[in-house]
């Protein structure tokens, strides 16, 4: 009898140990080295695979190196990943599917895909929420903005960026008066 119980316990434990629900969550980590300091991101490979792959492809190609945070709004977010320091927009890969319905929320410290008013228009640009922004979540007012990770180190840097003096540059508003440059973006953990 005790051998059967032991066998049953071993079987149940082995099934749950190898179940995806019990698997250790892995996330890709990216280090953004900026002129304002470093920001480390943990990307949610499981809930936002399309957005994470898109972001990682841009990181691996060196696309973000030399781009700026071109739109910063205190108490809201800091946006970057699409413009050079002279406010020239960089050519991007095709847009990706919007994953805003993945259950992740636009909370302080999360990173999301920026897009136009078109649902599936996100390319390279992203933003870091410096406040809880529930109105950007799926279904609040439209499809929403896809969260695909979070800041795990350097949130004080994002906060500092959000407080810099801004100005209008041509048609663009909320542009830092002194460029905040992403000097490099690289994968540090997979």
From Swiss-Prot:
<comment type="function">
    <text>PPIases accelerate the folding of proteins. It catalyzes the cis-trans isomerization of proline imidic peptide bonds in oligopeptides.</text>
</comment>
<feature type="domain" description="PPIase cyclophilin-type">
    <location>
        <begin position="26"/>
        <end position="187"/>
    </location>
</feature>
<dbReference type="GO" id="GO:0006457">
    <property type="term" value="P:protein folding"/>
</dbReference>
<dbReference type="InterPro" id="IPR020892">
    <property type="entry name" value="Cyclophilin-type_PPIase_CS"/>
</dbReference>
<keyword id="KW-0732">Signal</keyword>
<dbReference type="GO" id="GO:0042597">
    <property type="term" value="C:periplasmic space"/>
</dbReference>
<keyword id="KW-0574">Periplasm</keyword>
<keyword id="KW-0697">Rotamase</keyword>
<feature type="signal peptide">
    <location>
        <begin position="1"/>
        <end position="23"/>
    </location>
</feature>
<dbReference type="InterPro" id="IPR044665">
    <property type="entry name" value="E_coli_cyclophilin_A-like"/>
</dbReference>
<dbReference type="GO" id="GO:0003755">
    <property type="term" value="F:peptidyl-prolyl cis-trans isomerase activity"/>
</dbReference>
<keyword id="KW-0413">Isomerase</keyword>
<comment type="similarity">
    <text>Belongs to the cyclophilin-type PPIase family.</text>
</comment>
<protein>
    <recommendedName>
        <fullName>Peptidyl-prolyl cis-trans isomerase A</fullName>
        <ecNumber>5.2.1.8</ecNumber>
    </recommendedName>
</protein>
<dbReference type="InterPro" id="IPR002130">
    <property type="entry name" value="Cyclophilin-type_PPIase_dom"/>
</dbReference>
<dbReference type="InterPro" id="IPR029000">
    <property type="entry name" value="Cyclophilin-like_dom_sf"/>
</dbReference>
<dbReference type="Pfam" id="PF00160">
    <property type="entry name" value="Pro_isomerase"/>
</dbReference>
